[in-house]
Amino acid sequence: MNCSDVIRAIGRSPKTFVVAAMALSSAAAAQQPGADFPDGAAKGDVVTICGGCHDINRVKAGYTDEGWRTVMRMMQNFGAPIPPDHVTEITDYLIKSFPEGPRPQAALIEGPVDVAIKEWPVATPGSRPHDPLAARDGSIWYSGQLANVLGRLDPASGEIKEYHVNAQTGPHGLKEDKDGNIWFTGNFAGLIGKLDPKTGHVAEFRMPDPAAKDPHSLVFDQDGILWFTVQQGNKVGRLDPRSGEIKLLTPPTANARPYGIVVNSKNVVFFVEFGAPKVASIDPKTLQIREYPLPDPAARPRRLAIGQGDIVWYSDFARGYLGRLDPATGAVNEWPSPSGPKSQPYGMVFTKGAVWYSESAAKPNTIVRFDPSSEKFQTWAIPGGGDIVRNMDVTPGGEPVMANSLVNKVGLVEVKGGK
């Protein structure tokens, strides 16, 4: 008995089954990852390699030509299985097939404060400075993620000195301890590192769980304990620098993607869940995690800052909002960011009585100041375009500093007026 006989035996026409099978086959093909990508010799590589770590549709968002080159460098540094002789072909395919999409025009709003924005190119081209650090001695540090370097800029002279870390470390977050050591997350290598600037020696603290492969942002609490997020690994970590012991905590929400992290005046740790519409806190003594749901399920908080009265401010990257959470009551207030719902608010700090953040998708990127008293915004265009200010820090004098990833610069915002 052949297949047609079986089909007839259950009371169906072979022709009907053939048509149905063809329809199912076509539907399945349409649902294959990257099925709607433009044809090209590198299409298969893009689907296989990019889709190995990310939702393949992320590629459709597009980048500038230099943005795609930076992405390719990052993937190579991360250890993606890209054949060396395919790099140019893949890069050209991505540039041609997925150019940068429309970006909102920066909304520039005048106000009572004057600023001067200074920028310095970092020493290594294409290093993609990710995070800035304003050190106590007045220097500005940055993590050159794609070059595996930590850089120190003297703003007075413009002199830059870079320190190399191990290959494929992918330095990300930066913090200074009381002794002047620079701590960083090895985002590509599953580690926390400590650089002694006096000697150049780097100590590494490996994650105890291989699933915690991407340490992200970090902060010291008032007891000298280092806390850090692990975004894709869905963890928050606690490292005791005295013993090197690491404890990993798991948020109650699956795929929460812990991202920005800060500590308030009561030594309570707060972090945002970029994969969920939530802010969370950790009791440093009990290690209990409490989550604060945000009112809009589409919210995706990415960075946060502690303001006056321990109010938590956060940047809602997905919706284009600035948010305010009162942890005492759970009350949330929100304000639309000046450049609109697609402006992608990102790196932020609270200083000089105001919230300062950058709109990372506005063209050009902006520095935004929000006065909590008047609830008014003021904005400035970043002179060099910015092109993704992923994080910010504050100098001892209260000036915001930033790292401008895709234009390979670090910046200082000198505040001339206001509080």
Predicted features, each with a name:
Residues 29-45, 77:
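Electrostatic cytochrome c docking/interface patches
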Residues 46-57, 90, 94:
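The canonical Cys-X-X-Cys-His
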Residues 125-137, 167-179, 210-223, 254-268, ...:
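Beta-rich, blade/repeat-based domains predominating
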Residues 140-146, 182-188, 226-232, 269-275, ...:
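Conserved beta-strand positions in repeat-built beta-propeller and related beta-rich domains
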Residues 108-126:
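A short helix->beta-strand "capping" segment at the edge of beta-propeller domains
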Residues 387-419:
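Blade-level signature of beta-propeller repeat domains, shared across WD40, Kelch, NHL, RCC1
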Residues 78-107, 355, 400:
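C-terminal capping alpha-helices of c-type cytochrome domains
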Residues 154-158, 196-200, 240-244, 283-287, ...:
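Short loop/turn segments that connect beta-strands within beta-propeller blades
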